[in-house]
Amino acid sequence: MHRRARRMPMRPRRSKRVRNRYTMGTFALHGLTHRLPSASLQTTAARHPDVTQFSMPGHYR
């Protein structure tokens, strides 16, 4: 048994998520906006006006 488990260099976990949360503000919610039904998306858009642009088709996913 040869070890090929640690081929990738170690990096801190959740670094990408934390970076998104701090640099882009509400952009960290993009995962929620894609999975929520439209009714709750309306309430989310009412609370955070910038989130609506990330749920547009073709912007992120």
Swiss-Prot record:
Induction context: Repressed by RicR. Induced by copper.
Organism: Mycobacterium tuberculosis (strain ATCC 25618 / H37Rv)
Name of the protein in its database record: Uncharacterized protein SocA
Entry keyword Signal: yes
Signal peptide extent: 1-28
Keywords recorded for this protein, A-Z: Signal
Effect of gene knockout: Mutant shows wild-type copper resistance. Mutation does not attenuate growth in mice.
